[in-house]
Amino acid sequence: SQTDSEVAAWILDLFYSQVKDPKAAIKMLVDRIQGSYGFCILFDDRPGEVYSIRSVSPLVAAYTRSGALIASDLTALIPYTRKYFVVPEGHIVKLTGYKISLYDLEGDKVSPEMMEVNWDMDAAMKHGFPHFMLKEIHEQPEALKNTILPRMTKGLPDFTDDQIPDELFTEFNQVHMVACGTAMHAGMVARAFMEPLLRIPVTVSIASEFRYQEPLIDKKTLVIIISQSGETIDTLAALRLAKSYGSKTLAIVNVKGSTIARESDYVLYTHAGPEIAVASTKAYSVQLAALYLIGCRMALVRGKFNRNQAASFLMELLDAIPAMEAMIEHKDEEKNLVTHLIQQHDTFFIGRGLDYAFSLEGALKLKEISYIHSEAYAAGELKHGTIALITQDVPVIAIATQEHVFSKMISNVKEVKARGAFVILLTKAHAVVDDGLADIHIRIPDLDDRFTVFPIAVILQLIAYYASIGKNLDVDQPRNLAKSVTVE
């Protein structure tokens, strides 16, 4: 066989033929194999029984009026129940009709730890939207409020209810963020504003790289783990590695009771509700909001902000919410501009500083749901090679919201325009730009430079969405991709 799971089934069949006891055979199997897996097992001579076991890969189970259910993702259970339990590693689940039994590997029965999800099936419906992605784009302002407002007391960030003590933010001398994909891009944005604010090293690592390295972290390192599902396998492995070095870990996750949430020293739950579309939108925004809250609290307790400065920072963060709403309301601009985009094979995103961090996520969104080859570059690097790829009508999406490098960005835009690029320029409302510099110019409400990511994110998400629609593709389920990457 060329399939590892098929080999596991053959081994289990061999052991079961010897002992004729499902739990004993499963124990023999897991003693023999290594790696990550989540098995649901049927035995020919035991109709009406399902056995399950997992290692690293997630499994959740529930009792419902429809029967006993088990799945790899909580969303699958929500139409039937809000109460569930996470199958612990090294435990066997037996489902029979309406009954679920949980056993350890010695065969002793144990009681599962029941949990309750704080959203229901209504939150996982389209409600008149043609796609989940568009619905989730529209839900971002409310998701931000749900993440930020409960963590504000007298205008200041407060993690008392999250049981995150201020001591966590004073005992380290560096921050290391670890994540994959969109969550990693949220970390890139956070690094860009945290490092100059805190005046300590802030590093962002791709989890699939971090887990196989010997990272320079120790007991004086705060490792922030970012994952929407809380089950991303590379991120989970990175968390375990960080803990083995003695680092304190703080997880930012959206799913209560997920493996990463349970294994981290501290956890800050985002309150985005279910995100069904594979391409992340509102999860990205609330991860950013959580990171801005953390950065503000860090600055306050480390003496980089006084109370007035921290309160002002949070008010500016809240100002980003109506800015997002304005971009959602005027989404026809993005709908109209993709006509040119979808006729091209390549698209380039450029920016400087925070804008470069934004452009990374914009490029990912476009490629994952429209299948247009798209790359993001720091604008200052164009002349070091990438500008050779700029030819007539090649789309370049230039993000220019950072005041201190605005003139430099405009110079970069002129460079690509001179080589025939089709330029889509994103700036603040007050930006002064020469007529004819851009083929399309989209302005966002004026915000502090640190918070322009929120309306910019909406624009980039809508560009990707309408490009996918324009190419008649499956927006919510793009090819070859899964919502939660739980396998290596």
List the predicted regions and their residue ranges.
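Active-site phosphate/pyrophosphate-binding segments
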Residues: 31, 140-144, 148-176, 266-395, ...
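Short, glycine-/Ser/Thr-/acidic-enriched flexible segments
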Residues: 44-48, 57-59, 65-68, 74-76, ...
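Conserved phosphate/anionic-ligand binding catalytic regions in large, soluble enzymes, centered on
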Residues: 47, 52-61, 129-133, 144, ...
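Glycine-rich phosphate-binding loops that contact phosphosugars or nucleotide phosphates
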Residues: 170-319, 399-445, 463, 471
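Extended hydrophobic-aromatic, low-complexity segments
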Residues: 186-187, 203-204, 233-236, 336-337, ...
